[in-house]
Amino acid sequence: MKNRVHPELREMFSVLPEVDNSPENFQQYRKWAKESFTATVLSSNDKVTVSNRFIPGPERAPEVRVRIYEPTKKTEALPGVLWIHGGGYQVGSPEMDDKLCEKFVLEANCIVVSVDYRLAPEYPFPAPLEDCYAALQWVSNNSEDLSIDSSRIAIAGMSAGGGLTAALALLARDRKGPSIIFQMPLCPMIDDRNIKPSAFEITDSKLWNRKANISGWKMYLGSVYGEEVSPYAAPARATDLTGLPPTYTMVGEIDLFRYETIEYANRLMQAGVPTEFHVYPGGYHGFELIAPNAEISQRAEEEYIGALKQALQKTEI
């Protein structure tokens, strides 16, 4: 596999640990993930103010913590972005994406609300998605207090967060929920079936591979794994993608999710959804976070931040 990795990404690839999220090693995996993600938290920046709030959760469920990133100085209502972190539906927190959310604020001129949704296996589907929907409703209903322009709310996330982004777009459409101007599911985890060609092609134990993906989906779906799974859990199963918001998505060439992302982007276009899609040669899952100094990583990040900025701009009538 190493010879397929982009030259700029090989150094970090060589030091990656093996991914083992199996049930017998899960607590160790969660501990490792927490320690790894903590190393990426935000350094102080006087241009961005970060705060935490607890908001009403779904019906008969606990409150949900959200982490809010906003410009320290703002003079008008800004577009809002609901960000959903990754972690295979099993690990992670808003803090792991502090640096990225700060960049969204500074470069896309927006306010970011990152949702600390409940995690599997303790809280399988639909709990994580319902937490995200509750956060979307809260942002929309409290937009004036948050200084957010309610006509310019986007949703975005990476990996499992990308899967939840795609699912949330479907759910908001079908429930006739808050209006979403743009969705940005990045390298999204959207297909529980694990039967696409790239699922069998990407086997290296240093990468999120088929074994890890099956384990993740089993934890997220719980008792319904292997059954006729809801498209709100696995958006690749959705048969109707019409009426979804304009979309930007991307994936690395040697990412397990390559095939399902390509299919998803293609089906969005067939459904008449304005869609931009990028694939990065030699990119493994999460490459731009794992090797942030590589030129290809910086290009990928610049391109999706640029797409978000453009989508959030006011349209003159």
What does each of the following model-derived ranges do?
Residues 1-68, 313-317:
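A glycine/proline-hinged amphipathic helix-loop "lid/cap" segment
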Residues 60-64, 71-80, 242-244:
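Proline/glycine-enriched tight loop/beta-turn segments at coil->beta junctions
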Residues 95-114:
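Short amphipathic alpha-helix adjacent to the substrate-entry channel of hydrolases
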Residues 123-145, 304:
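Alpha/beta-hydrolase active-site loop
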Residues 140-155, 175:
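Gly/Ser-rich "nucleophile elbow"/oxyanion-hole loop immediately N-terminal to the catalytic nucleophile
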Residues 170-227:
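Hydrolase active-site cap/lid region
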Residues 249-251:
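Short beta-strand/loop motif that positions the catalytic acidic residue
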Residues 294-317:
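Catalytic active-site module of serine/aspartate enzymes centered on a nucleophile-bearing elbow/loop
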